[in-house]
Amino acid sequence: MAKGIIHYEVGEQVDLFLLIKSATKGIASNGKPFLTLILQDKSGDIEAKLWDVSPDDEERYVPECIVKVAGDIHNYRGKLQLRIRSIRPAHPGDAVRIDDFLEKAPLGREEMKAKVMEYIFAMENPNIQRITRYLLKKYEKAFFEYPAATKNHHEFISGLAYHVVSMLELAKALIHLYPSLNKDLLYAGVILHDLGKVIELSGPVSAAYTLEGNLLGHISIMVSEISKAAEQLGIQGEEVVILQHLVLAHHGKAEWGSPKPPLVKEAEVLHYIDNLDAKITMIDRALEKVKPGEFTERVFALDNRSFYKPAFLSVSKPKNPGSKE
């Protein structure tokens, strides 16, 4: 099996097919245009610069384009980059498909769907359950295909659903520890909090922000969707407002993009488990790229910190002296 792009080290030569995840135009200090490419395979992605680009290059090297790249890995300001020596678009004779380069959630869609439905069926409040089921059914296909973000966390196929399933497991554990939490509100909040991303983002591959995503954002989108769902189902009452509040408050603070701070206990918990799952995922993905005893590259979304991968954790545990093995 070929080595994934994130497992290459500084100085290693690269000669392989990759998928363009994003392409951003810039102007160099010499006044010439260049492209910042994010290139990916199933292991993850890496940044590369394509210098002195022509108008044809700008049209040729776009998101969802498979390219054959040769070059080497170097360290730029604490982050690995692919220095391009040659690049060309793939052609039919190369026998490569976009699906060959897409990272996917560790769980299959049907397995995740079964898990999400299990939590919906556990809800006892009929209004909360009906609104949640209605919205999930309305956006089911996209929910189980889309990433949770364009970068930073769960930015892979079915990442949104995988993020939700992980959060539901966290919510279940916390409800066991703190029985005063209302499971209906917390489970519904987990399922709905990021559902607006199926409108905010363009699709499961090379996701970008849509017009609605740029002008409204997933939080405002889902608050509106909850209101429309309640009206369609003939549901009135406090549950509707609190579900909207859970979505509005899940980023925690205004400076983190939250229109309201959490003012309901379940909203506070939702914020913490959302934050925890996202951050653990970011750290894990950074640690996957380094060997034991090394620091990761800086993680911008985590205050630009580098994380250490303890060397002792990779050492096999000594056998128990009393063991017969």
UniProtKB/Swiss-Prot annotation:
MF (Gene Ontology): 3'-5'-RNA exonuclease activity; DNA binding
Enzyme Commission no: 3.1.-.-
Listed name of the protein: 3'-5' exoribonuclease YhaM
Pfam families (alphabetical): HD, tRNA_anti-codon
Family as reported in the entry's similarity comment: Belongs to the YhaM family.
Transmembrane listed as a keyword: no
Role this protein plays: Shows a 3'-5' exoribonuclease activity.
CDD domains linked: HDc, YhaM_OBF_like
SMART domains in alphabetical order: HDc
Keyword annotations of the record: DNA-binding, Exonuclease, Hydrolase, Nuclease
InterPro entries: 3'-5'_exoribonuclease_YhaM, HD/PDEase_dom, HD_domain, NA-bd_OB-fold, NA-bd_OB_tRNA, YhaM_exoribonuc/phosphodiest
Cysteine disulfide partners in this protein: none
HD domain segment(s): 163-279
DNA-binding region coordinates: 14-90
GO biological process: rRNA 3'-end processing
Superkingdom of the organism of origin: Bacteria
Record bears the keyword Transport: no
